[in-house]
Amino acid sequence: MAKEISSELLNTILTRVGGPGNIASCGNCMTRLRLGVHDSSLVDPNIKTLEGVKGVILTSDQVQVVFGPGKAHRATKAMSELLGEAPVQDAAEIAAQNKRQLKAKQTSGVQQFLAKFATIFTPLIPGFIAAGLLLGIATLIATVMHVPADAQGTLPDALNFMKVFSKGLFTFLVILVGYNAAQAFGGTGVNGAIIAALFLLGYNPAATTGYYAGFHDFFGLPIDPRGNIIGVLIAAWACARIEGMVRRFMPDDLDMLLTSLITLLITATLAYLIIMPLGGWLFEGMSWLFMHLNSNPLGCAVLAGLFLIAVVFGVHQGFIPVYLALMDSQGFNSLFPILSMAGAGQVGAALALYWRAQPHSGLRSQVRGAIIPGLLGVGEPLIYGVTLPRMKPFITACLGGAAGGLFIGLIAWWGLPMGLNSAFGPSGLVALPLMTSAQGILPAMAIYAGGILVAWVCGFIFTTLFGCRNVNLD
């Protein structure tokens, strides 16, 4: 195991969050170890000073420790092993902690809600990235080498093979989301997956594609399986709640036989009658809102300028349902490259700080260690190690990101919208081959590269002019 996530470090973190008895849950996203806590008053905020920890975000019931990509997963696995060896609490202590946890939840409802999205979508992100990269590379090769869509031979076969993963992922994505969502909301994953599959089935007997459900109406009422991800999330939440209510009254001997059966019947009825139409309306409204924001240069600037703040508070995972809605409505994720400009603005700010710092200062060492991950789309080392502790550079980094978002918004406003070819992917320079547009991959790559360049330059200029005054540059 790497030094940064040694057992000594994890034991220290465990002690500083109040010990094993204060841990309610242990999980991770791409870059953070997420520890749910019963009592936040027991948490020592100086965890962020530990060597190997790149930052800490504290909420009323969760501690997010920033390690970085890959390391967060290893840290979570090791921490889970440590927690598994922890002594069992007595009933009185558990009751007292549950009371404190309930009180904390009353003041953090929004963060609790958004944290669910991390639980649902974080396990899917590596697949999004892999499938998106393969699709982007295949599309780039086909464009550069002028390979027709109906071409035959080894190269076309290889390109089709690279593209098939993206098709498979997005064809059956709702089933994966339904499974994870049902679990996140406290239900059984397979029940959520089965309910999600109802949104995939076809209800038109004359259709020549898809999977026919076997009926075209629900007891005489029309079926309109719209809403996709939004509807599936609502249905999975309802499924978990209904399962909990059914299990509360179900005798233990009949639980395995009847609980899921009754849950599926009730949830499917609600899905056909209420959730599918409701999800469709919400889906259309959300798509309309963000499509209009994406085509509005000022809206793009605001979104890009505020995204770093969302990352700091750990609520950026809340955008993932929007990404999926845009994929369904546009065929690409036009919001993601706009938000990616936030990280590019931070790179420009960090370079300005490096330029203004003394040759052998600690700040220069910090920037050198964090700039490469920043260029590749991993922004936490720059946020928590360089810009946020000095505040002014963090603000100018946000302004640099806003300038990049404004650039992409202007290009879209002039008639060339572009976006990511996947619901989620890497940002920074790594995302270049994942860009796509109605005019092809090369114009999309050029626009994205232009936005990054604008954000770099503006972040550098804003920080040089306004972000270094009365700021510690040592």
UniProtKB/Swiss-Prot annotation:
PROSITE patterns hit by this protein: PTS_EIIB_TYPE_1 (PS51098), PTS_EIIB_TYPE_1_CYS (PS01035), PTS_EIIC_TYPE_1 (PS51103)
GO molecular function: kinase activity; protein-N(PI)-phosphohistidine-sugar phosphotransferase activity; protein-phosphocysteine-N-acetylmuramate phosphotransferase system transporter activity
Catalytic activity: N-acetyl-beta-D-muramate(out) + N(pros)-phospho-L-histidyl-[protein] = N-acetyl-beta-D-muramate 6-phosphate(in) + L-histidyl-[protein]
One GO CC annotation: plasma membrane
Annotated source species: Shigella dysenteriae serotype 1 (strain Sd197)
GO biological process per UniProt: phosphoenolpyruvate-dependent sugar phosphotransferase system
Domain notes: The EIIB domain is phosphorylated by phospho-EIIA on a cysteinyl or histidyl residue, depending on the transported sugar. Then, it transfers the phosphoryl group to the sugar substrate concomitantly with the sugar uptake processed by the EIIC domain.
Keywords: Cell inner membrane, Cell membrane, Kinase, Membrane, Phosphotransferase system, Sugar transport, Transferase, Transmembrane, Transmembrane helix, Transport
CDD domains: PTS_IIB_glc
Protein name: PTS system N-acetylmuramic acid-specific EIIBC component
Compartment annotation: Cell inner membrane
Record membrane topology: Multi-pass membrane protein
Residues in PTS EIIB type-1 domain copies: 1-89
